[in-house]
From Swiss-Prot:
GO terms for molecular function: chorismate lyase activity. Keywords: Cytoplasm, Lyase, Pyruvate, Ubiquinone biosynthesis. InterPro entries: Chorismate--pyruvate_lyase, Chorismate_lyase_/UTRA_dom_sf. It comes from the Bacteria. It comes from Sodalis glossinidius (strain morsitans). GO terms for biological process: pyruvate biosynthetic process; ubiquinone biosynthetic process. It catalyses: chorismate = 4-hydroxybenzoate + pyruvate. Pathway: Cofactor biosynthesis; ubiquinone biosynthesis. Belongs to the UbiC family. This is Chorismate pyruvate-lyase. The gene is ubiC. It is an enzyme of class 4 (lyase). It is found in: Cytoplasm. Removes the pyruvyl group from chorismate, with concomitant aromatization of the ring, to provide 4-hydroxybenzoate (4HB) for the ubiquinone pathway. Transmembrane segments: none annotated.
Amino acid sequence: MQDQAIVAILDGIRWLQEPPVWPDDATRSWLTERGSMTQRLEKHCGKIRVRRYREGFVTACIEAWEAALLPDCGRFWLREVVLYGHDRPWLTARTLVPAAAEAGPAQQVLSLGDVPLGQWLFRHRPPARDVIQFGRVGTLWARRARLRLTEGQPLLLTEAFLPDCPLYISGGDAPQQ
């Protein structure tokens, strides 16, 4: 599957209005992970590879639910990526940062390049997570969260767990070969 099709999965997420009934404890553990998802994935492959699909400033093309969770500034930094483990796509993610964050701690997000967001986010003090919601795309799981950085700056992160992700493997925390 091409990165364009993988990233398009983010647009098809059906967000759940109620907390989900988890199929098992492993799924719940993955979806409610409060630490770095990058670190959790790297336990299964050693090193995550990031492929950027789209990155740059956008205006007015964000979804209504995204706008409701971020300050009304009209301009946002958008980063859409696919994370690969063992050369297989495991997770696709979208990060939105208000343009006003260019002057604060979030300015480093604008220059991450191929560095995983989680590697930067959890390097020092973990961000506060004040909103989290779960969703589905067919049989795939997704989550979105508003994170607050050190000065309270918001960052919106949406993640969809792709079919080859260790989440879906029986015993989802056993390292893969």
